[in-house]
């Protein structure tokens, strides 16, 4: 029997590249924008405010908005503009209210900000907005991914003009010449399932935690940050594993113009840090002596005032975004660094937009309550020499 002949399929002519891109773009646009504008939940704020008003919430609308989301309406709109394209172009299924209306970009951003600002459970945040727990989870993570990518320009090492301004302000405010910032660390505490609870993550206070290191300017803006490392390591080791350390050691930053002091000494650029850090040519720690001289005491007082800038910044960060100050319940350790980074970006955005924090927002106590500084013995001669010059300079 002769083999059956198969019919030839008509081959479609391939679309040229330009037409294919245009077709895909149009398809995305159609899928992303609802046909019925009334199906979008645009009056979310009025509904939310009515649902969540209480004696502890300010009666003034603008103050109430900032109370819930840590940002003014103007700053909130700017944040929405950063992530709008991402939130529209990749809408997951199920992003609807209990009433059945689609979530607007503004409401998605509000849900994410409220989750980060309050640190409340996804169930509680969902109830406050009239959405389910899974919606809060999806919305928050999509917002984090989008802002992490779109707000990078709010956290980068300053250019030379800005560095000169920072150095001038630190000297004017605290008397330390050529100082570029203050460095410090804080712990993000979490619980871990038994299978993940290794000693690496168990810190000196027997908590499971992740480190966050920040370098701050005089306005308490992050100039640099690193996170993701276990709280069980020492601060000096965290520093050496950080990109900031490599940049400084390779003279890619903190290598600007030195300043000549009245006694003729040349002072290079540096940051100040506490006793947990090593004394390096570009990282100046306080004098540690059982019998300090008057000049050492005077230097340490100035040094502590600069270092307190970083401590206050962490108080504001953890007070504004309380998800960082509460004990996190079994977080995904791969995602946690992104959550921390986005909170740092939001911290800078609020400052960059000229916004302000309400008085009750910063933590009332220390940002790392219960953690004592562990002394680092490492001392480099050039660092010791620079500290000596600064100490002598403050006596004049």
UniProtKB/Swiss-Prot annotation:
It is found in: Nucleus. Pfam families: DDE_Tnp_4. Its cofactor is a divalent metal cation. Its EC number is 3.1.-.-. Residues 1-29 are annotated as: Disordered. Transposase-derived protein that may have nuclease activity. Antagonist of polycomb-group (PcG) protein-mediated chromatin silencing, probably by preventing the association of POLYCOMB REPRESSIVE COMPLEX 2 (PRC2) with its accessory components. Needed for full reactivation of several floral homeotic genes that are repressed by PcG. This is Protein ANTAGONIST OF LIKE HETEROCHROMATIN PROTEIN 1.
């Amino acid at each position: 029997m002769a083999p059956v002949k198969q019919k030839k399929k008509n081959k479609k002519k391939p679309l040229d590249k330009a037409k294919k891109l245009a077709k895909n773009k149009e398809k995305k646009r159609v899928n992303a924008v609802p046909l019925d504008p009334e199906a979008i939940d645009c009056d979310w704020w009025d509904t939310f405010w009515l649902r969540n008003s209480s004696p502890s919430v300010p009666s003034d609308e603008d103050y109430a908005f900032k109370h819930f989301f840590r940002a003014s309406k103007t700053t909130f709109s700017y944040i929405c503009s950063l992530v709008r394209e991402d939130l529209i172009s990749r809408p997951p299924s199920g992003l609807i209210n209990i009433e059945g209306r689609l979530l607007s970009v503004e409401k998605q951003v509000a849900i994410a900000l409220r989750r980060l600002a309050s640190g409340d459970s996804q169930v509680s945040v969902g109830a406050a907005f009239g959405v389910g727990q899974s919606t809060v989870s999806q919305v928050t993570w999509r917002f984090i991914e989008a802002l992490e990518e779109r707000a990078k320009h709010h956290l980068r090492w300053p250019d030379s003009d800005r560095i000169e301004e920072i150095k001038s302000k630190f000297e004017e405010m605290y008397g330390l010449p050529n100082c570029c910032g203050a460095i410090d660390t804080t712990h993000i505490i979490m619980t871990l399932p038994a299978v993940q609870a290794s000693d690496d993550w168990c810190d000196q206070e027997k908590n499971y935690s992740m480190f966050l290191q920040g370098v701050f300017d005089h306005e308490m803006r992050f100039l640099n940050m690193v996170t993701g490392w276990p709280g069980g390591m020492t601060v000096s080791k965290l520093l050496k594993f950080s990109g900031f350390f490599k940049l400084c050691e390779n003279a890619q930053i903190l290598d600007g113009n030195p300043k000549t002091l009245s006694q003729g000494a040349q002072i290079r650029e540096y940051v100040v840090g506490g006793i947990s850090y090593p004394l390096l040519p570009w990282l100046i720690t306080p004098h540690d002596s059982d019998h300090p001289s008057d000049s050492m005491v005077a230097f340490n007082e100035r040094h502590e005032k600069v270092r307190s800038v970083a401590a206050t910044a962490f108080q504001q960060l953890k007070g504004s975004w309380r998800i960082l100050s509460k004990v996190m319940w079994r977080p995904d350790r791969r995602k946690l660094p992104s959550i921390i980074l986005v909170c740092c970006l939001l911290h800078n955005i609020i400052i960059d937009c000229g916004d302000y924090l309400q008085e009750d927002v910063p933590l009332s106590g220390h940002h790392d309550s219960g953690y004592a500084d562990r002394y680092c013995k490492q001392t480099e001669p050039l660092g010791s020499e620079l500290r000596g010059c600064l100490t002598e300079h403050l006596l004049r």
